[in-house]
């Protein structure tokens, strides 16, 4: 077995292992508006700008471990962090200690880059807890009926729908992150991952105050008479309303 960083010429094997491990089917690609070649092309920046280590059996990629370089607000101080993702192994190579080796090598590389924190979305909390991670936040989903929402609000500004790459929208997130503990600052890689599986009918609405200054946004999808809110942030009570 050989361990080494992945290069752009490993993109086919990288993409194949991701699709196999996370069960991304042709139907999933079609429903999200992607084609396989487009997904593969979109992953080139990851291999260029992220730290991806793979384990090879000869010329065959058996396992991989990716770390995205990001920044995070932790109690008002900005830290460089490594966001762990694309952790996957073909089943015939599991139980051989490969992932443990990839994890150690990746964490050692993070340490050399002065990234003191490693973050991830665990598919198994007990598994990663045994390896030293702990929960820093929870995700709670709410189902709200339209009649439960206040119809009269005191918000003198205006709401405008904008494009996904609107600069005011992305700057709003950075402004929010500067004052919010536990919030990541999104760089280009993070924004690409944020949108990767969203449907084309997903919208971004930005609230502007009377001075035409953006104060909050909502990312949402309306489907089958239901509104799904992916993300909502606001800088003040006016924007919240």
Please place each PLM-identified region on the residue numbering.
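Short amphipathic alpha-helix that is part of the acyltransferase structural core
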Residues: 1-69, 76, 83, 149-188, ...
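Conserved active-site alpha-helix within GNAT-family acetyltransferase domains
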Residues: 112-116, 122-140
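Short hydrophobic beta-strand motif reused across regulatory alpha/beta modules
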Residues: 65, 133-134, 218
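Amide-forming acyltransferase catalytic core, primarily the GNAT-like/NAT-type
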Residues: 139-241
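Conserved acetyl-CoA pyrophosphate-binding loop and the N-cap/start of the following alpha-helix
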Residues: 93-105, 238-241
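Short, high-confidence coil segments that cap the C-terminus of an alpha-helix
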Residues: 50, 113-115, 202
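Conserved acetyl-CoA binding element of GNAT-fold acetyltransferases
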Residues: 79-91, 226-236
């Amino acid at each position: 077995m050989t361990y080494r960083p992945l290069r752009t010429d490993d993109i086919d094997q990288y993409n194949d292992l991701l699709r196999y491990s996370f069960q991304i089917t042709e139907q999933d690609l079609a429903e999200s508006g992607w084609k396989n070649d487009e997904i593969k092309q979109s992953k080139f920046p990851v291999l260029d700008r992220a730290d991806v280590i793979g384990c090879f059996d000869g010329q065959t990629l058996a396992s991989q471990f990716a770390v995205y370089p990001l920044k995070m607000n932790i109690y008002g101080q900005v830290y460089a962090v490594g966001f762990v993702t694309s952790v996957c192994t073909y089943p015939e190579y599991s139980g051989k200690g490969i992932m443990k080796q990839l994890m150690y090598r990746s964490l050692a590389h993070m340490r050399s880059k002065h990234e003191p924190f490693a973050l991830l979305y665990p598919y198994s909390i007990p598994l990663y807890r045994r390896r030293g991670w702990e929960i820093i936040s929870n995700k709670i989903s709410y189902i709200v009926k339209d009649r439960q929402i206040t119809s009269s609000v005191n918000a003198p500004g205006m709401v405008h729908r904008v494009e996904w790459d609107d600069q005011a929208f992305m700057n709003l997130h950075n402004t929010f992150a500067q004052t919010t503990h536990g919030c990541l600052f999104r760089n280009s890689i993070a924004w690409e991952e944020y949108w990767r599986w969203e449907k084309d009918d997903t919208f971004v609405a930005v609230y502007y105050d009377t001075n035409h200054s953006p104060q909050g946004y909502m990312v949402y999808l309306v489907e089958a008479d239901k509104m799904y809110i992916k993300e909502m942030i606001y800088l003040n009570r006016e924007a919240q309303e």
